[in-house]
């Protein structure tokens, strides 16, 4: 057998393995028994891989790889999203840098430019996903602007339109004056800002209780130009006399009424609230209830429209300053307060959003949200972790009609056509330039495009042939799982459920797996502007894809957010290092080195059944069976963090540190062949279990391994797969026969004794060759088990004498270790200077006591606790707790010498 290279280099090995997989066609859809279908959440076509993508894709690949190895019919659909506003913004910026305006070149040429941009940059993220080792079918990549996908989008719109679920209406929307398009509530980003609350005087048309004016409080004085009323709370008796009266609106001289409305908070400002129905959603509701005029004072760029004198042509910021100045000059600025408040911003360009009354297209959700709620409440769709169910149901219960129109050029154009001659209007699945009603040729299509989420809501079924080839969905829909971020439970997940139930009468997926948000090391969100983001490709270049994937999977706990351990250069914004990913790489190296050692000792090996010949074999096979069950079940239940950490604990701490150590002596004796078979059985099973987590290194090792019992057919002939990724998965049912609780208990006792001896050597810096006198006290049953392992314990612990019994006495001058109900005493007399050791320990105790007293004094200082940063206070508390634990341990050690 050819010897494995001494070192494993991810930078050269991983690309070579990737090419092997691609050349072998192993990523392609495979048919089998049972199905596992996953549709990758489509990243923006012009985007690049970020830590969220890397986490998401690592989870999905683990699911798919295990399913493929279990012989299931697997389909992992890859695709990208056209990302309407994101792509249009980038292309717009590019054209401007070339001195070109999209308005100059027109819609058709601009859309062509978007396609050019998509073709030029669209493949970057797909290549990055490929480099991660994600086993998607790259030959069947989908795009939300593909012709057949566009037909699906169009059919959905037309069906909902004709079913009365899509309508056009005037509503308050979140408007971005920079992108000049509507933005959904769920896409708006709230930012805390320092602002002001201006108190303005509005003159009464006739005095009330001796007052000539009222005072309204507002954070947006510029919108007063569009005020059409003033509201007070019905709970405020002091304002009752003003109800039914009117004020003369300054600047515009518009007489507007004062009325009562339950929307008003009597404790806000003076209790009088200006009402601007065209520029505030609450005011819009009050305006509807009280039949107030809706006056839009801004155009689509948030510039004051004609009819407002000196204010016309001002942008909203200029208008604010001018209005405040006017009120101040006319003695109507009562006073100003500083105010911290939350302001909505566009998620794409960061401009402050403008509540703006405009005509838009909407989906009426009342008929859609009920079935979507039932799907989750009945368990047809299950969230993991379960707490995200509440996020889904709360959003769905409070769902308002969905604004689906966007004032963009790049995207799915709304398929509604209008006849200018006869007023005909209809939604059509095919374009037309002739009116079917009057035969006229003055027909035009709606200028708006659909919200990106409208098209992506169809992702699980439109990517698999619907509606053209619905038979392709058979066995693959509902899909197995959707792995995604919590940020888009409302934007995407809920809408996918609504549309799938409506058009297919089934849910789009059975499980929704929400992974934690990956934060920067300091707990802040990763972002380009902060320069604290980590590029997954930098991690792969530094540590390899396996190390990155494994580290990310260990972070997939039930926590909502997790900090990623990475150090970033503040000047260059480049990755310096990632200690946790470095540790993950060490695990990859351990797997390689342990496998290489075993394969170097396989001379004369032939495949055959594993046989329990020693207590270590029985223990290892039992632990192996439990590892098979643990990995399989935890991938099935989507508890990836527990699974990943459990794999390392098993392979490193149990297989490498103990079983290989105990068994390697047998490789030199008469039992060599059976020891080889047992070791290869354990190694092969372990490598298969770790493959979904770390596919590259496991594939490379497996390629160097001889056949094991797992590769033998019913007649005992070798029938080995071409690649590990299509080899057979270790099924828990096949390993259940190896579970042996007694054998596990016996060997755990052995490990306790040996570990106590080794820990004593380490603590007191004793030579590994120094033989120790060890005394073990335990129950009779455990002593019997330990005696059966005496021949294993003595060489591993390197004992001069080993006394074991239920009633043995604690030797003088010995250190005690208690674990698993067993007391292990290691005699130190003659091995260390007891008096010097005791003096050293007492000195450490005194130092720890002194430091603890200082910590407690500081923490008792109320000024420190109140004024110091919470993190500093907590650090001091943690240190005090740590010192107490140290003192307990040191005191116990001193007692050992007494």
Question: Model-found features: residue ranges?
Answer:
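Residue patterns forming the tRNA-binding/recognition surfaces of aminoacyl-tRNA synthetases
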Residues: 2, 7, 16, 20-24, ...
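Non-catalytic terminal extensions that flank enzyme cores
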Residues: 1-51, 74, 347, 591
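N-terminal catalytic cores of NTP/NDP-binding nucleotidyl/phosphoryl-transfer enzymes
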Residues: 30-91, 153, 216-219, 223, ...
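Secondary-structure transition/capping motifs at alpha-helix termini
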Residues: 65-73, 94-104, 127, 131-136, ...
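Conserved phosphate/anionic-ligand binding catalytic regions in large, soluble enzymes, centered on
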Residues: 48, 54, 79, 160, ...
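Feature 926 captures the class I aminoacyl-tRNA synthetase adenylation module centered on the KMSKS loop
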Residues: 199, 394-454, 458, 502-545, ...
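Catalytic alpha/beta core of large soluble enzyme barrels
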Residues: 60-61, 221-301, 324, 328, ...
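Glycine-rich, acidic and aromatic/proline-enriched surface loops and short helix-turn segments
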Residues: 120-131, 252, 456-466, 553-554, ...
């Amino acid at each position: 057998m050819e010897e494995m290279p001494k070192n494993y280099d991810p930078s050269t090995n991983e690309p070579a393995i990737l090419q092997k997989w691609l050349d072998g066609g192993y990523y392609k859809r495979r048919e089998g028994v049972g199905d596992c279908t996953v549709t990758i959440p489509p990243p923006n076509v012009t985007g690049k891989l970020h830590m969220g993508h890397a986490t998401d894709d690592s989870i999905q690949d683990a699911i798919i790889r295990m399913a493929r190895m279990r012989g299931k019919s697997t389909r992992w659909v890859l695709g990208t999203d056209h990302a309407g506003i994101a792509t249009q913004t980038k292309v717009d910026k590019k054209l401007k840098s070339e001195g070109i305006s999209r308005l100059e070149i027109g819609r058709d040429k601009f859309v062509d430019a978007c396609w050019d941009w998509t073709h030029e940059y669209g493949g970057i993220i797909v290549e990055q996903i490929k480099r991660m080792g994600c086993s998607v079918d790259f030959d069947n990549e989908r795009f939300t602007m593909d012709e057949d996908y566009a037909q699906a989008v169009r059919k959905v719109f037309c069906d909902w339109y004709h079913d009365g679920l899509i309508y056009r209406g005037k509503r308050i929307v979140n408007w971005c004056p920079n992108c000049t398009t509507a933005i959904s509530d769920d896409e708006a980003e709230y930012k805390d800002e320092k602002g002001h609350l201006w108190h303005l005087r509005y003159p009464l048309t006739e005095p009330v209780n001796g007052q000539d004016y009222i005072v309204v409080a507002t954070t947006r004085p510029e919108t007063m130009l569009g005020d059409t009323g003033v509201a007070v709370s019905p709970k405020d008796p002091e304002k009752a006399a003003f109800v039914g009266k009117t004020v003369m609106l300054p600047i515009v001289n518009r007489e507007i009424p004062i009325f009562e409305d339950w929307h008003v908070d009597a404790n806000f400002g003076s209790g009088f609230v200006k009402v601007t129905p065209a520029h505030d959603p609450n005011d819009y509701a009050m305006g509807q209830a009280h039949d107030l005029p809706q006056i839009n004072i801004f155009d689509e760029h948030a510039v004051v429209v004609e009819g407002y004198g000196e204010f016309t042509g001002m942008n909203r910021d200029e208008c604010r300053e001018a209005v405040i100045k006017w009120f101040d000059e006319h003695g109507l600025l009562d006073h100003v307060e500083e105010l911290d408040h939350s302001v909505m911003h566009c998620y794409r360009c960061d401009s402050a959003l403008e509540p703006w009354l405009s005509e838009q297209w909407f989906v009426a959700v009342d008929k859609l949200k009920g079935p979507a709620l039932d799907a989750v409440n009945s368990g047809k769709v299950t969230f993991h972790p379960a707490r995200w169910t509440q996020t889904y149901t709360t959003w769905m219960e409070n769902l308002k009609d969905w604004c689906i129109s966007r004032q963009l050029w790049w995207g799915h154009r709304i398929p509604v056509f209008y006849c200018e001659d006869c007023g005909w209007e209809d939604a059509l699945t095919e374009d037309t330039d002739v009116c079917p009603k009057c035969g006229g040729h003055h027909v035009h299509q709606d200028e708006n495009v659909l919200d990106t989420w409208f098209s992506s809501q169809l992702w699980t079924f439109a990517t698999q042939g619907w509606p053209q080839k619905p038979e392709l969905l058979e066995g693959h829909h509902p899909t197995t799982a959707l792995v995604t971020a919590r940020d888009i439970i409302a934007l995407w997940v809920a809408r996918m459920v609504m549309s799938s139930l409506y058009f297919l009468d089934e849910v789009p997926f059975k499980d929704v797996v929400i992974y934690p948000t990956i934060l920067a090391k300091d707990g802040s969100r990763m972002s380009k502007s902060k320069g604290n983001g980590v590029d997954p490709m930098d991690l792969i270049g530094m540590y390899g894809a396996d190390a990155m994937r494994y580290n990310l999977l260990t972070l997939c706990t039930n926590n909502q957010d997790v900090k990623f351990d990475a150090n970033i250069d503040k000047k260059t914004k480049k990755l310096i290092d990632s200690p946790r990913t470095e540790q993950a790489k060490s695990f990859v190296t351990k797997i390689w080195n342990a496998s290489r050692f075993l394969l170097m000792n396989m001379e004369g090996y032939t495949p055959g059944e594993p046989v329990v010949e020693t207590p270590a074999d029985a223990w290892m096979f039992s632990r192996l069976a439990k590892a098979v069950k643990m990995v399989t079940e935890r991938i099935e239940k989507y508890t990836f963090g527990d699974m990943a950490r459990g794999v390392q604990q098993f392979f490193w701490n149990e297989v490498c540190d103990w079983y290989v150590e105990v068994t390697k002596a047998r490789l030199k004796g008469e039992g060599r062949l059976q020891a080889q078979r047992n070791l290869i059985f354990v190694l092969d099973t372990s490598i298969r279990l770790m493959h979904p987590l770390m596919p590259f290194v496991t594939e490379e090792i497996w390629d160097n391994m001889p056949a094991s019992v797992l590769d033998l057919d019913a007649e005992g002939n070798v029938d080995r797969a071409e690649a590990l990724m299509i080899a057979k998965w270790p099924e828990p049912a096949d390993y259940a026969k190896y579970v042996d609780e007694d054998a596990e208990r016996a060997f755990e006792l052995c490990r306790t004794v040996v570990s106590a001896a080794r820990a004593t050597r380490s603590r007191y810096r004793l030579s590994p060759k120094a033989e120790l006198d060890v005394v073990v006290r335990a129950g009779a049953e455990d002593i019997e088990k330990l005696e059966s392992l005496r021949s294993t314990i003595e060489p591993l612990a390197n004992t001069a004498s080993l006394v074991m019994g239920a009633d043995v006495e604690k030797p003088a001058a010995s250190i005690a270790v208690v674990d698993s109900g067993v007391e292990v005493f290691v005699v130190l007399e003659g091995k260390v200077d007891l008096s010097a050791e005791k003096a050293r320990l007492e000195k450490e105790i005194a130092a720890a006591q002194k430091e603890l007293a200082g910590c407690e004094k500081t923490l008792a200082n109320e000024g420190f606790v109140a004024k110091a940063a919470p993190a500093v206070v907590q650090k001091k508390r943690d240190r005090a707790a740590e010192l107490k634990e140290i003192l307990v341990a040191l005191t116990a050690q001193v007692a050992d010498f007494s």
